[in-house]
């Protein structure tokens, strides 16, 4: 199964071509009113008793700055034309690798830099100064490289700040998509149907979507449904195993696939209602080390941890 977003007026006409898998919503858009505040609070909470406390606090400062930039720099767009075009082509409407960016994302980056300067330590301040002095051409090259997953072209010290601006920009655009999602037969379920990026982790929900697993996009913050007991990367079901650091009742586990040799974190709200896709993934890097020691490669990227040059 794959997911496509179509204009609302086309949904009824095309419903018979796909399947809604019962009443399961195939796609959930982020609630930007609470997303960054909740993430900040969770990062700060996890930092209280974690060997990575300093880095979790650092990430919390970035998400706090994202919340302020969201408030100070709203974005209003008419996405109807992009949605119609993407529905016809079968491509994500905000495909990060080809979508034409405006200067808005650079305004967001400038706002983040200005906010983070206040109490930044010297080594972070040096990175912020470097980005602040970068030309438009340099910044756009950095953005192109990150969005096309060519991480070697961007220093790992710069990437979290650039990505924070890009992600906020994409999340603002995604929140204004005037369409509905439908599930249909197809491929590439491992990629976000909104922007084509990859997940940071997956979350098994409680409440309205109780027991359903959604992959959380590391760019536009949308979530898309992928059934449990299936590899989110290759969709095989034969050789899946679940790993944790504590016990079978752990709220954070890693799902490994023997077919493709990858793993993805799964966060269970049933075990801990406070789990958050980015924060809990970042706070459980010891589990990543365990998985790499077992010979598995991570199939996702956390927006605060990019591969080095």
UniProtKB/Swiss-Prot annotation:
GO cellular component, one term: cytosol
A Gene Ontology molecular function term of the record: ferric iron binding
Domain of life: Bacteria
Listed Gene3D superfamilies: FdhE-like domain (3.90.1670.10)
PANTHER family associated with the record: PROTEIN FDHE (PTHR37689:SF1)
UniProt cross-references to NCBIfam families, sorted A to Z: FdhE, PRK03564.1
Family as reported in the entry's similarity comment: Belongs to the FdhE family.
Designated name of the protein: Protein FdhE homolog
């Amino acid at each position: 199964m794959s997911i496509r977003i179509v204009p609302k007026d086309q949904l009824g006409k095309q419903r018979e071509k796909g399947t809604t898998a019962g009443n399961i919503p195939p796609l959930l858009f982020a609630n930007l009113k609470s997303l960054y505040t909740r993430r900040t609070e969770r990062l700060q909470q996890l930092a209280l008793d974690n060997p990575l406390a300093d880095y979790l606090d650092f990430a919390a400062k970035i998400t706090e700055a994202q919340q302020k930039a969201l408030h100070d720099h709203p974005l209003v767009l008419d996405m109807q034309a992009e949605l119609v075009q993407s529905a016809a082509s079968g491509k994500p409407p905000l495909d990060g690798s080809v979508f034409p960016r405006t200067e808005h994302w650079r305004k967001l980056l400038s706002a983040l830099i200005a906010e983070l300067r206040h109490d930044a330590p010297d080594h972070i301040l040096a990175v912020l100064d470097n980005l602040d002095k970068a030309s438009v051409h340099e910044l756009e090259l950095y953005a192109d490289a990150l969005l096309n997953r060519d991480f070697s072209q961007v220093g790992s010290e710069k990437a979290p700040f650039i990505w924070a601006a890009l992600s906020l920009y994409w999340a603002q655009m995604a929140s204004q998509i005037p369409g509905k999602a439908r599930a249909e037969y197809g491929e590439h379920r491992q990629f976000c149907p909104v922007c084509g990026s990859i997940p940071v982790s997956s979350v098994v929900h409680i409440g309205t979507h109780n027991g359903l697993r959604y992959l959380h996009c590391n760019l536009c913050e949308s979530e898309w449904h992928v059934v449990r007991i299936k590899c989110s990367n290759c969709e095989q079901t034969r050789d899946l195993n679940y790993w944790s650091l504590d016990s079978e009742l752990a709220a954070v586990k890693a799902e490994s696939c023997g077919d493709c040799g990858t793993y993805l974190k799964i966060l269970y709200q049933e075990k801990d209602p406070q789990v958050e896709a980015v924060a809990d993934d970042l706070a459980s890097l010891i589990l990543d080390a365990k998985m790499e020691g077992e010979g598995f490669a991570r199939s996702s990227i956390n927006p605060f941890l990019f591969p080095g040059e």
